[in-house]
Amino acid sequence: MSAMTPAVEVENLGKNFPLVRGGLDWLRLPFAHPTKRVLNEVSFGVAPGEVFGLLGPNGAGKTTLLKILSTLLEPSTGRAALAGCDVVHQSAAARRQLGYCPGFDRAFYLRLSARENLRFYGALNNLPRRPLAERISSLLAALGLDGARDEPVRNFSTGMLQRLAIARALLHQPRVLILDEPTRSLDPTAAAWLRRHLREELAGRQGATVLVATHNLTEAEETCHRLGVLDQGRLQAAGTAKEVCRQAGAATLAEAYARLTTPEKASEEARPR
C-alpha cells in the first residue's frame, strides 16, 4: 500500500434528510423543517492498493456514505474526493475514476443479453471495441456467466444479476471500486472468486482502491486491509481488524462489532429520502 495521497478522502462528512413526508407537512411547517442527521462528521482515507471494509448495522449510514462517494447524493457538510476529484465540484471527473456496484439497483436492459448490456456500458465508458469484447468474455467466464452470455437478462436469477452488476463495475478497470454488500446473493464459488479478485488482483496487482460495505465479519477480516465501523452516522473505530479490536477492548472482531454498534432499529432503506 502506498503512502501517497489517499485515493478516497472523506473529511467531516455529514448528511441531513428532511423528516417531512409531503406537501401538507411543508404547509404546516413553513419556517422550520426538521431533519434527520444520517451522517455526522465522518472522516477517513483509503490508500491506493487498499481494500477498506465498511461495517455497521442497517441504518448506520453506510449506503448513504457510498452514494455520496459515488456522486449520487450531495453531502450536507464536509467534503469527499475520489482520486483527487471532489465528488460535488468535480463529479464528472470523479465518476470516470469509479466503478460502483449498488446493493439492489441493477439498472440493466432486461430484453438485452448479458453481453449486450456490458457492451452498452462499455461504450458509455468509451472502451475500444476489441479490448472491450475480450474484457467482457473474461469477466463473464470468471463470474460463471459465460454459459448465459447471450441469454436475456430478464431470465436471470437474483444471484446472476448480482454477478452481472459486479462485471459491469469492473468493466472499465476503475481506479476506485465501491461495492455495497457485493456477495449477498452470490454462491460460495462466486463469492470466493470475488474476494480473491478484490485483494490479489485489483488491489494487489493493479493498485486499485476498493471500498466495500458488508455485514459478513469473516469476509471483511479475510478480504480487507483495514476496516471502519459505522454506527448511528458516526465512525466509531477504524484500522486493521486487530486495531479495531484494541480500540473496542475486545478479543475478536465479532465482540468489537457488538461493543461498537447498537441493536438495529430500522432499516436504512426506510429512512426519509
Task: Cite the ranges covered by each PLM segment.
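Catalytic Walker B motif of ABC-type/P-loop ATPase nucleotide-binding domains
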Residues: 177-181
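Conserved ABC ATPase "signature" region
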Residues: 24, 119, 123, 130-148
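ABC ATPase "signature
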Residues: 238-239
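Helical segment within the ABC ATPase nucleotide-binding domain
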Residues: 191-206
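A short, surface-exposed alpha-helical micro-motif characterized by mixed small hydrophobic
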Residues: 220-222
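Conserved catalytic motifs of ABC-family nucleotide-binding domains
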Residues: 173
